[in-house]
């Protein structure tokens, strides 16, 4: 896993150049690295040349002047310390271990050929492919558990195995693929991979030393058209766009049960086990434990209406009590108004007044109301006569009236004058006032002081 973090930090560039010599067939020799380091091997393409001994040219941060069009200048991925220190020695050892068994199979079209070189000692396999019509040659390095490939403008998959690690390089972008999955492929297992090609790693490429190849006739094949067979590669004949494989990071690994175990707390096991879905409140309690306290709120909401209803009941009771308090008062007022007790009291007052009037008019007379009133009238008339007799000397018009009066009236007036004067009475005779016969009794008995009569 740590190999993909080692990028272009080694500070050295390398290039594989091939010496141009006429040959009968086109081939390419690729060597694998035994250590953890990864490298890219490419040679120059010739339409009519055989693959001869290739040599590696190590240059420092520069480009080779030979065949700049046909060569790749790839960045060296830094691997283990062994690859950094003795890189040339390792390359020389890999060149010495090449080619003990070769298998050449010609396809139906004359444009492609395979050459397989296998080392018996280290069990390294190298699959070489060359297209005379293409100037760019991708190469795939596959290991026991790790796979990688190199891409250019056109893609053609081929495999060669190394022991430790592999690298995916695409036009200067280098990515180490430490997983067992192939780029642009589906989920893989440690023993098999689906996608570009399927490979069993029990016995290398296969039980035999030779690697058979299949004819490629279709111009475009999907990933699903590649089947898996023991010891065989199912490869594509036509070139695929390199942008499919240009990735700056390895593909995401398939989700393992451990990752799902992190989210296991959010799922309801009852919902997965049972066919029927649980009630919504159970699901909410399992999915969101933080939402469980709001379940108490409906209880508080239920309690609040109860409290409100209790308050309303208490207020209604108070209103009823107040109404009961007011109702007796109204009933009392009605009973007092309807009861004969106030009339009886008024009757008592009237009787008292009649008794007092009877004491004034005729103390020794009858006590009934009619007789008391008649005596009161006669007494009032007597008083008027006394007033007129006493006021005649003070009034000019009252002389005639004085002659008409009898002598006993004058005697009574003289006898009663001290009493009237002692009481402070100031009586005016009726004759001196407006005639009573021409006016109402009300105006007579209640004259307007300081004004004239009507």
Swiss-Prot record:
Protein's recorded name: Transcription factor bHLH123
InterPro entries, per the entry: bHLH95_bHLH, bHLH_dom, HLH_DNA-bd_sf, IND-like
A GO cellular component annotation in the UniProt record: nucleus
Gene (UniProt): BHLH123
SUPFAM superfamilies: HLH, helix-loop-helix DNA-binding domain (SSF47459)
Organism lineage: Eukaryota, Viridiplantae, Streptophyta, Embryophyta, Tracheophyta
Keyword Transcription (UniProt): yes
PROSITE patterns cross-referenced by the UniProt entry: BHLH
Compositional bias annotation for Basic and acidic residues: 303-324
This protein's record includes keyword Transcription regulation: yes
Composition skew (Polar residues), residue ranges: 185-195, 207-228
Compositional bias per record (Low complexity), positions renumbered to this chain: 101-113
Domain bHLH: 334-383
